[in-house]
Amino acid sequence: MKKSFFEYLMTQRNPQPNNEVEEFANQAFFDQVFPKQSRDFDEISKYLELNAGYLQSMSIFDSAWQRYLESEQF
């Protein structure tokens, strides 16, 4: 069964973040209304654009999404 994007993102959490994706994962963990079951790029992207003040740039999401897609190929 494929993971949702949020499930994948939680694998990137790190108490001492080394990059922007890890920081994004740490912050998303505390976002109680994040679309946790979604696998849809547009749904998550729109949510983040409107609600995620903790995300400095949407390019961070794009990078995380690309890693998510790569992880789902295996």
From Swiss-Prot:
SUPFAM superfamilies: YozE-like (SSF140652). Coiled coil: none annotated. Signal peptide: none annotated. Belongs to the UPF0346 family. NCBIfam families: PRK13672.1. This is UPF0346 protein PEPE_1063. It comes from Pediococcus pentosaceus (strain ATCC 25745 / CCUG 21536 / LMG 10740 / 183-1w).
